[in-house]
């Protein structure tokens, strides 16, 4: 019986430990440091607020691209929308719905359409009227017009 329970527990525990970005990410309050890519991420999506001891509180705001860029400019201090390459670094194929480590990015939620799209600052070269986004529920990359409302997470370079 003990062996049976161990065999049931083992795959579940392996699945829980497989989604782990702590080898390159660390948290300092509301900022996530990415040592590998020399970036700093806001722990909370725009619209959510960081509360010490609770993490991200609230729901990510759904913003047009211009609204997200305006919010980054308002915050200053080098915060900006990430490029497609930068945002892609937060995906981990070992993580499931969302496809990133929830210990670092806890406020990624289904927007009601079985997706969690996040803006990038990168236009699609072949169709410049479309801007890349990443769906963090499924790890899909696609493009949309800048007037579509999606979540946004800001980044800044870190020397």
Language-model features: locations:
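Short acidic, Pro/Gly- and aromatic-enriched capping/linker segments at domain boundaries
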Residues: 17-33
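Hydrophobic h-region of N-terminal signal peptides that target proteins for export
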Residues: 8-17
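An exposed tryptophan-centered "aromatic clamp" motif
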Residues: 66-78, 84-138, 142-144
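Short aromatic-cysteine micro-motif
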Residues: 30, 35-80, 84-87, 91
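Positively charged n-region of N-terminal signal peptides that target proteins for export
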Residues: 1-5
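Extracellular structured ligand-interaction cores
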Residues: 29, 114-116, 131, 149-152
